């Protein structure tokens, strides 16, 4: 279930496959330029590998694959959004991330039934702002224990 959005909450807007998504800034640690992940064998297909981010081994998820969307080309606009998830950081590859908005309660609506029905990541809320419709995505809906930790070597 998507975390409750509060009036005045700031959200990062990012693009995946031509659609705008938003995530609370409270879930985002940083936004990084593209760097090619090192492959890790035996992980879920949507886990691209790991990157060394300021000395921290960080698993990277291809958000397009996680949302069952078509392949894409890496461009100068491609970004990795670093998400703080439980006690680790996880990167999401997105087409671009270039906007921060402030959301008000009156702009938030429940998503119509069946939104993102072809994936196990549900979109439960939508922000209607000016001429934009933004799917609110919650890190917990994308990252589960298995996917986020299966790319990280045992720390024991």
From Swiss-Prot:
Pfam families recorded: CheW
Compartments reported by the entry: Cytoplasm
Domain CheW-like per the UniProt entry, residue ranges: 8-148
Keyword Zinc part of the UniProt annotation: no
Keywords annotated in UniProt: Chemotaxis, Cytoplasm
A GO term from the CC aspect: cytosol
GO biological process, one term: signal transduction
Chief location: cytoplasm
InterPro entries reported in the protein's UniProt record: CheW, CheW-like_dom_sf, CheW-lke_dom
Result of knocking out the encoding gene: Chemotaxis is substantially impaired, with a 30-fold reduction in the efficiency of chemotaxis with aspartate and 11-fold reduction with 2-deoxyglucose. Inactivation of cheW appears to have a subtle effect on chemotactic behavior in the absence of chemoeffectors: the bacteria display a smooth swimming bias, with some tumbling. A double mutant lacking both CheV and CheW has a strong tumble bias, does not respond to addition of attractant, shows essentially no accumulation in capillary assays, and has greatly reduced methyl turnover on the methyl-accepting chemotaxis proteins (MCPs).
Keyword Endoplasmic reticulum part of the UniProt annotation: no
Function: Involved in the transmission of sensory signals from the chemoreceptors to the flagellar motors. CheV and CheW are involved in the coupling of the methyl-accepting chemoreceptors to the central two-component kinase CheA; they are both necessary for efficient chemotaxis.
Protein name: Chemotaxis protein CheW
Organism encoding this protein: Bacillus subtilis (strain 168)
